[in-house]
Amino acid sequence: LWWLYRDDLLPKPTKFCGYARSMLTTETLKEQCLPYMKVQPHEQNKYEEFWALNDYVSGRYDGRTSFEVLNQRLEMMENKNKANRIFYLALPPSVFEEVTVNIKQVCMSLCGWNRVIIEKPFGRDDASSQALSDHLAGLFNEDQLYRIDHYLG
């Protein structure tokens, strides 16, 4: 994301909000990411601008309450502006269903489009892959879904 931002390949004003179970802060994430970002000295100001657009929410994958907190943070970041939301799920397959239900029920943008990207093995076999596809079809339109499978990619 940093490289896309650095090269002005993202629409303005794109903002980023991470969500995971880990108890982290945005500052901690910034420190942990720095060795991998390949920031050149002349890019330091832009790098700081990039991190000013980032936020992080720690929460559970099960239950609605954490997703309500996430949605409140997203709304705060959007500041009542029209906003599109992309949910990039790099999660254990065992939590896909509960997380996608919570996203659908709590975190969808009401005044922009929504997309869900699912990255991971998409099921263990044909039957589990079909079950996940059926679950997602009950929540989202096909044009809202993107699937990235480590094994097929």
From Swiss-Prot:
Residues that hold NADP(+) according to the record: 21, 120
One GO term describing the cellular component: cytosol
Subcellular location: Cytoplasm, Cytosol
Pathway: Carbohydrate degradation; pentose phosphate pathway; D-ribulose 5-phosphate from D-glucose 6-phosphate (oxidative stage): step 1/3
Enzyme Commission number(s): 1.1.1.49
GO biological process: glucose 6-phosphate metabolic process; glucose metabolic process; NADP metabolic process; pentose-phosphate shunt, oxidative branch
Entries under Gene3D superfamilies matching the protein: NAD(P)-binding Rossmann-like Domain
InterPro entries: G6P_DH, G6P_DH_NAD-bd, NAD(P)-bd_dom_sf
Main location (coarse class): cytoplasm
Residues annotated for D-glucose 6-phosphate binding in this entry: 120
Keywords: Carbohydrate metabolism, Cytoplasm, Glucose metabolism, NADP, Oxidoreductase
Reactions that this protein is recorded to catalyse: D-glucose 6-phosphate + NADP(+) = 6-phospho-D-glucono-1,5-lactone + NADPH + H(+)
Pfam families: G6PD_N
Molecular function terms, GO-annotated: glucose-6-phosphate dehydrogenase activity; NADP binding
Family to which the UniProt record says this protein belongs: Belongs to the glucose-6-phosphate dehydrogenase family.
Function of the protein: Cytosolic glucose-6-phosphate dehydrogenase that catalyzes the first and rate-limiting step of the oxidative branch within the pentose phosphate pathway/shunt, an alternative route to glycolysis for the dissimilation of carbohydrates and a major source of reducing power and metabolic intermediates for fatty acid and nucleic acid biosynthetic processes.
Protein name: Glucose-6-phosphate 1-dehydrogenase
Taxonomic lineage: Eukaryota, Metazoa, Ecdysozoa, Arthropoda, Hexapoda
Primary gene name: Zw
